[in-house]
Amino acid sequence: MSQPSLLNQLNNIVDKESCGDYLLIDIIGKGGFGVVYKGLHKTKGYFSAIKKIKIMKKKKLQSESQISLMAEINLLKVLSHHNIVRYYEHIPSSSHSYIVMEFIENGSLEKIIKRHGLLPESLVTVYIAQVLNGLEYLHRQGVIHRDIKAANLLISTDGSIKLADFGVATKVSDLSSDNPDDTFAGTPYWMAPEVIQMQGISTACDVWSLGCTIIELLTGTPPYFGLAPAAALYKIVQEDHPPIPPGISAALKDFLLNCFKKDENIRSSAKQLLHHPWVKSVQIRNPETQAPKNARQEILSYNAQLQDIIQDNNSNITRPRSSAVVQPPSPSQLVPPLTNMNISSSNDNNNNNNNSSATNNSPNISSTTTKNNSSTTNNNNNKLTSPSLSSSLLPIPATSTSTVNQNKASPTLNSSWSAVPSNKISQTVNSIDKSSLNKINNGSGQHVQIASPRKLSAGQKQSIQPNIIAAAATTTTTTTTTTTTNAATNTTTTTTPSSTNTGSNVTSPVVSAISTPPPIPTTPLSPMMKSQEQLNQEKEKINLHLRKFSEKESDDEFDNIVLPNSTICLQKLQPILSHKPPIQLQRQQSFNANNNISNSNSNNNNNNNNNNNNNNNNNNNNNNSNNNNSSNNSNNNSNSNSINSSNSHKLKLLKFNKFTEKDNEDDETDLVFDQKVSDTSRFKVRNQKKDWDDEFDNFGSSGDESESSTATTNAAINSNIAKKILPSNRIIRYSSSGQLKQQQQQLLLQQQQQQQQQHLQQPLSPSEMKLKVKETSEEWDTEFEESFDTISWSEADNQRTINIQDKYREQVVKTIVEFILQLKPNQPNDVLIDTCQKLTDLFQTYPDERKLLISNGEGGVYFRLPIITILEILEDNCCCNSDTPSDVITTTYHHNNNSDTFSEDFSNVELVINLLKLLNQSIIKEKDIQETICLMNGISIITKLATKQFDELIREEVSKFVLQLCSYSTYSLNMFITGSRGCKVLVDLLDSDYFNGFTLIHNSLDAISLIFKMNTASPKTALCHLFAKTALMYRISYLLNQIFNSSDKSATSKSQQFQQKQIQQQQQLLLQQQQQQQQQQQLLPSSSSPNLKFPVLSKSSSVKNLSKDQFDKVLAYSVKAADILLFFSTGDSLVKEEMSQSNVIKYIVNVLDEIYTWKTIGNNIRSFLLKILKVIKNLSMDPNVRSRLDDAGVIPPLINYLKKHGGIDKITEIHNQALHSLYYLLLLDRSRQEKALKSSILEPLLTIIEERGPLKELALPILFDLVRSCNNRSLLWKCNTIDKLLDLIEDRNWFADAIESISTWATLESKLVFEKLNSGGTISPLTSTSTSTSTSKSSPSSSSSSSSSSLSTSTSTSSSSLQLPTSSSSTSFENHNIPLRLIGILNINHIKHPSFQKSIIPLFNLINGSQQLLKSLINEGLVNSLVECLRVDSSPVSKITLLKITASIVQSPSLLLVDKEQTNSLYQILNEISKQDESEIVKKIAENLVLELNK
């Protein structure tokens, strides 16, 4: 049975798709340009990645795809780098093209973070350093990748990063000004701004994408990933830089800011970023650059700090006492003793013996040490455990040695755990002695399992073996560890002297402390790299001679240059003191400061070479090496102490001293060469070997020469050192006597003065005036490094703090879990209240741990979901309290306030309040907890407490809960609105006395505002309908009336209620303080400050009696309530109908009336008033609502706000809203117009018209409607309305409506109007009505007298020369002014106006209504105006009306008043019209008029 299955499997493999010699097995990736397969070679059996690209059938697309494909292949062919995926071959076919590349086993970093989670910053540093190496190589080759992201970064099993997917890559050489590559290529979220704007591409766009990739590795998504691609592209271009993720180090933040510079010209390049401290921190974390420390002391110090943290945690937080709770471990249990650390006197003796033998025969000891280490590691391998699972999940390169701890620590470095008290950490650092070790070793017997280094491969052992042999020469009796370094692989192995004994099974903890993962396999060295290795050996050989200038412990701190013979040195220094300071003084200074650190391994290699080349001098060399190593060890110890105590300020001082000049000062501010430099500067020196090439060319001879040739060059070396180190403008301090120092200083001062005089006397040469430019790449590299010198990196200190913070977090989590386990329904109320208060305080201090409420296990303790238990307890107590009214609960509490025990009802109330506080504290900005509460039906349980039968404090906590639901999660908001009748709950919360508990009302208003701002499942119109049915508008209008229109009686009662409420809360505060003192609680609950919740009112609860701060707060929420009303007023007719109920509008009217009575109305009140007036305006626009507004009495307050009010600033805006509302309300409704007249609308209306502002356009239609349809005209006469209408005749825009209103008024009150038009005086309607009979009898005589007076005083004026005045005339008119105004309608400038035809009809009616008026018009030149209009006008309609006016003149007796000249011109124009006009009607009328004139 097994053979057929095997054959079937083989057949399946054979049946796979193939291309050339490869089988396409599995799909490992898909993209926009093709599919990537995992391929298997048919004959050789190795795997490869094969990219399959389909060839387009269309010729145009086929050519474009072929060009891009060949471009990618040509790029891959020429690229050869360790961090770039390797290209094998190209296999074309008829339908597809196949690119065969190197297969990377673990896939991309994108898959890694999706599969295993986010990467810590320490691991990201390792990977990005390799990406930068690959990018630097690409950019050096002139290649732009253009698609750097995590999906295109492949990771192999040894941790190497490979750049892949060169489908959109291009070469810089292909770009030019004539052919720039402005194509929109790449992935949107990783694109640089210049690519999005199509401004041309450069290598800087890859640096931007690299910064986005770092954020992707740290957070899981690139910047702006939550937005749509188009929106993300807009954000990239508009904002200064993408958002920097929180919780990262300062070095990484600076690195990202260098990547995200908008200007690509100033953006850092990949070569520059390789020198950034964040990238260099990969090598700083390598143990080879750290000073050796006492491992035992470090472990004891760390454990003592943990003990102190645990004790501090236990003292601050009182843990519950329950047998069901798992007790926390004791300090002795939490800090177990170390295994294999039995240090006795015999072991010390063995160590000393082994060390002494090591100094005599170094090579043998090194070999045995290696064997013993490997054997010890193998023997104890089964006993040791891995420190973290990250090593099994991710391939970690050898350069990262502290990622194990940082995988846990880095996400919480900047979180709430940074609040761990630093004094508690630092108190026990220096308090460790042997007694503490004995106490730990005599503990409970638990053992700490120390991880050993992973087993090395054979090739790795061979690469490490030569260094182990070389490192054996440095083994001394004063050191406990020896470190060997492989320069090619950066691998560090640590051995102990006690492990050299083959019979000993002791494993040193230092091995595990400094153990590293396996190194990255390196490629064979090229011939150029081999020559570089030889140069490095030569430089290291010269370091032996530089040791003579190192400082001893007994020397002065600033005397770093030690010369064996001072007189000889002076003779050698005198001829060279005139040299200028070297350019790379700072690097040489750092080199000398770290001479002892960097020479330990180089001396060993030098000695081994001498042993192989010269056997005669073997013993001498060994002795010299031992002596040198002993001095080196002492110097290393001193250096390690100084490194631990130094900071970044000394490094900055060394940098700045290079640019200072102090000739006359003789203190410590001169240029010094201090040995005590920080880790950053030492790291910098160890990574500047390439920058030292030009300096080492002058040092020593080649490695093949003998020591005799080296000895002959000592003088040259000393002189070269002096040239490089000693500037001519600095005072050098020697380690000789004081007299010698004074002589040297005087000599140097003389030399400086002579040089300055010579320099001033000699003119500058042209060569000296030229700008000096750096010529070598090493000088530029140094410039890159110095640009990042301000950024410090202290990895060791941060790591210790992070570890202690993690331990502190574990203790807090245990405490929270213990409290959660006590939340049980069967517990007494006092215990539950105390537990809720403690959990609330803990969650407030440590908000990150609130997620424990929705987890069912932590630290091996599995329990029920805590949020379910809390809701059950809350529901049980809600059922108990639902039958007890709030006034009964308050009374019970009031009578028992002096007793030591609570009643059962009040204990339930207090428990409910504390449970709600715990829930409110846990859901702040926590969407997961909110959604979990929604799923557990928690909303309905909690919102039952919103009704008025429960206590105000309970309802206040419910309002806070509702506000949190509406603030952050759309899901919880939808569940609250649609599934739990949220609209009804919010209205219930508003049903409260504002001045007794406005916090819950404020929360409710905030929640309602947020509901309409967030995206909900229901449309906004449906939400408006839901709220309208729940009487929300009534509650808000009643609330506003309660705030602004409180009566004295209600105010007094509310004040008394508030005082009782305040006394109740103070008593509750005292009882809570007593409980806290008994339980030794330091934190006060949120209810401990009642004075901040409610205003203190003395006489009245009106808003006018509040203080300024309280008034501003109340007014702010009043504006928010007005905003809600304004939003509903813009709804459809159904919402407006619900909103226009009489019980809603009447409260709004009361608010308007109350505010109008205030003497001063500030800007804040004015903004509120504007919103309320806008609400009425929006409602008045609906015809179905106007009658309801009228019934509610809206018109009088609106008219009040049209009047002048001295206390309102910028009253024009108020007039605008009120006038709009009146316009819609008074439109075509005579009854409402009558009400408006009775409310004295005319006076403010005429005032607005006289101001000639923009509101005039709204006021005039209202005035015309009042004139045309009003029955109570006595008010019109009282306000001289007709005079205003006569003024409007001269207004070009309103002359037609004005003459029409006058004509309509004349039809209703013809006698009074014509008397006004004929006399020009102001006539009282009452007087005219009482004397109407006498006036009618004497009308002929009066008319004749008026006509005679007009003839005697009038002057003839041509109508063609009449100009319309722009300013309004006086209210009292003379007799001849009114005819002139009426004749002005016939101005030829009005003929083309659209209202001209409309205006001449009422003029014709006025002429026919009064012969006296006609005579006055004829005397003022009516005939001339008619002739001009008939000649110009071409409209038959208006011409017919003009001919009718002409007929009235011809047929009336007033024709005799027309002179002969006017008659002739009239006859002439009528004759022309009768013959030439196009209209037959016009011709006929003109012919009849001609006949009349002929008679």
Curated annotation (Swiss-Prot):
Molecular function terms from GO: ATP binding; metal ion binding; protein serine kinase activity; protein serine/threonine kinase activity
Residues holding ATP: I28, G29, K30, G31, G32, F33, G34, V35, V36, K51
Region annotation Disordered: where it falls in the sequence: 315-419, 476-519, 593-646, 693-712, 1325-1373
E.C. number: 2.7.11.1
Keywords assigned by UniProt, alphabetized: ATP-binding, Kinase, Magnesium, Metal-binding, Nucleotide-binding, Serine/threonine-protein kinase, Transferase
Protein name per the record: Probable serine/threonine-protein kinase DDB_G0278901
Residues in Protein kinase domain copies: 22-279
SMART domains, sorted: S_TKc
Record organism: Dictyostelium discoideum
Cofactor(s), names only, from the UniProt record: Mg(2+)
EC top class named in words: transferase
UniProt keyword annotation of S-adenosyl-L-methionine present: no
